[in-house]
């Protein structure tokens, strides 16, 4: 089998395993829904590195995330997995799959001549880790709250969003370009990485606060990716 075929098989096994883990933790270990949902969210976002590892063709590599646009919507509608879709859940899982798919189609070129995957991965990591930790810390430890566009958040959560986004953007743009995962990506200057990290984190924090009903899963990755591209 080619790496692309193996990548497809492993991707769906990985995704299925994530869903099962989230469901088992919720149903049998009584882990709260908001935590199991974020565990699955982080696991899904981190699989972008698995995609970069396995696939040599972006046309095939986008299939797993693209297919989960429809699958996540189905899961959301029928509430098949209570570990990720509670009664008050948003379409965030659908939006996240859409943003990753669109960014991959537009920017990921594993065979060259120029691959912009580091920028899109920076956007995905900001959403993967920044949003997850901001939501959890904001919910459980946030005491200073504000409401925008019908969504209530905390200043503590937004601060976490900024700091975590800054760290993951910096690490992504420092370590990924020119590596074995993205050999055709241009290596940015240190100044460009610092600018992208600070500006990207600021944009991620503001956009996350302004985006209602799970749409931050769409807006944050796209906006941070654009910042990374402009800074680089």
Predicted regions and their residues:
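Hydrophobic alpha-helical transmembrane segments in multi-pass integral membrane proteins
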Residues: 62-66
